[in-house]
């Protein structure tokens, strides 16, 4: 089939990508955050992340210089199997994390390192991320937020 191009034309091992944006909030508020750095499917016998880690690549996220730690993973198995149900590895399968947005601009920074594109823990090492601010119940996007890497309100 046809390959869909990624951001990097020739991605290299042992590199780190950074992604950032600013989010304008019209008011100080607590919102939900869905974040993930590896999307899991049970067609692969991938292992869930280790406790306290987002993934096996050491990805990290900060909002306004405060690191956002991952949730407690419900799947804790250490043996690869297609027969073990997914837990809350994928962001839409868990309640969003509660995070604080200040009134005005909020900096969101992601660190996305890749050592190797092969791993004993996951078959398809994905250089990807999802970062979405949602209502605390996870039902919809937060109204009134403006996303801009240049801090423009347009």
Label each PLM-derived region with a short phrase.
Residues 1-27:
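Extended carbohydrate-recognition surfaces in non-catalytic/accessory domains of CAZymes
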Residues 19-32, 97-103:
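Extracellular and analogous surface-interaction loops
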Residues 21-27, 37-41, 114-116, 135:
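Beta-strand elements of well-folded, non-transmembrane domains
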Residues 27-51:
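A short beta-strand element within beta-rich, extracytoplasmic domains
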Residues 47, 52-129:
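Beta-strand-rich ligand-recognition modules
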Residues 112, 131-138:
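Short beta-strand-to-coil "C-cap" segments at the C-terminal boundary of structured domains/repeats
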Residues 140-154:
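Activation corresponds to long, low-complexity, non-globular regions
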């Amino acid at each position: 089939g046809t390959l869909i191009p990624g951001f990097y034309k020739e991605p290299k091992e042992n590199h780190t990508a950074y992604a950032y944006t600013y989010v304008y909030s019209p008011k100080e508020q607590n919102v939900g955050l869905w974040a993930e750095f590896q999307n899991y499917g049970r067609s692969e016998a991938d292992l869930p992340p280790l406790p306290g880690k987002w993934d096996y690549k050491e990805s990290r996220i900060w909002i306004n210089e405060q690191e956002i730690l991952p949730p407690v993973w419900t799947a804790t198995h250490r043996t690869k199997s297609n027969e073990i149900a997914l837990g809350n590895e994928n962001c839409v399968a868990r309640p969003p994390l509660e995070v604080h947005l200040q009134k005005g601009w909020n900096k969101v920074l992601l660190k996305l390192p890749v050592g190797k594109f092969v791993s004993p823990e996951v078959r398809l090492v994905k250089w990807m991320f999802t970062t979405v601010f949602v209502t605390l119940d996870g039902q919809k996007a937060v109204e009134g937020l403006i996303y801009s890497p240049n801090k423009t309100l347009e």
